[in-house]
């Protein structure tokens, strides 16, 4: 009975997300030109989405992770974490605007501070449902489920940005999706992979198993810190040779690689 209740709640939240994420395209408010531009932009985004999904499921098969768990985690990132984060970010933005009106600091750093603290926990929320329905016993499986949720979130966020960019015209919309495709090399999928390993290791430490506590703190700090930097004015620094974004990207990828090495070495930690 408990498992059925969890499944129903999960399906309900996914259905809400599906309606929320698609209503703009089905309510008749878009013009023919906007539909065309939307189609072109999504087609471009598929050049990273399809390979990313292919490698995700190939690794899942290699690591013997149940395919249904991977699919549910991916859908959860798209249609559960996405709309919950959107609502949470909006409400927090409105609240901060009331508490600290005309704050130059918040204007510059609100997204950098709020987004990691809101989105990283919510991207892990689908895993709570997935693990309750399909328990896994390997740290690599947990790591990959986190990556899947982050990738799903990243994909739906990119589509959402296409939608909001449409009024700015063809040139702006295309340039923005190309920018997001390039930056996708180290985006939400890396943050979530780092975060899930960090949170699990800290949970183990809370339960009295101290092995990996230091690494857990480092991985979680990397997830939040790199997300902060990507949303901060730091990445807008202009130098003769591009440095800001490559530096943050390198930090994220290096941290992710270290998390992967830890997971490979300690795969049986969940047993």
Specify the residue positions occupied by each region the protein language model found:
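Hydrophobic alpha-helical segments at protein termini of multi-pass membrane proteins
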Residues: 1-271
């Amino acid at each position: 009975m408990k498992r059925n209740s969890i499944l129903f709640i999960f399906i309900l939240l996914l259905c809400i997300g599906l309606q929320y994420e698609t209503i703009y395209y089905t309510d008749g408010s878009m013009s023919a030109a906007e539909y065309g531009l939307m189609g072109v932009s999504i087609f471009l985004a598929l050049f990273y989405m399809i390979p990313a999904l292919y490698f995700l499921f190939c690794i899942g098969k290699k690591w013997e992770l149940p395919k249904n768990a991977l699919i549910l985690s991916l859908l959860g990132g798209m249609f559960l974490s996405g709309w919950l984060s959107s609502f949470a970010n909006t409400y927090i933005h409105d609240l901060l605007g009331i508490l600290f009106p005309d704050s130059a600091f918040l204007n510059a750093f609100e997204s950098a501070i709020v987004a990691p603290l809101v989105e990283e926990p919510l991207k892990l929320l689908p895993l709570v449902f997935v693990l309750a329905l399909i328990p896994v016993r390997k740290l690599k499986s947990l790591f990959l489920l986190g990556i899947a949720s982050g990738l799903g979130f990243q994909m739906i966020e990119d589509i959402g940005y296409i939608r909001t960019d449409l009024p700015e015209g063809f040139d702006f919309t295309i340039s923005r999706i190309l920018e997001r495709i390039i930056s996708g090399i180290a985006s939400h999928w890396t943050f979530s992979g780092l975060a899930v390993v960090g949170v699990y290791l800290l949970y183990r430490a809370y339960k009295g198993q101290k092995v990996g506590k230091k690494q857990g703190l480092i991985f979680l700090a990397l997830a939040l810190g790199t997300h902060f930097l990507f949303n901060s004015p730091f990445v807008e620094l202009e130098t003769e040779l591009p440095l800001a974004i490559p530096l943050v990207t390198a930090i994220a990828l290096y941290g992710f690689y270290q998390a992967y090495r830890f997971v490979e070495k300690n795969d049986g930690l969940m047993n």
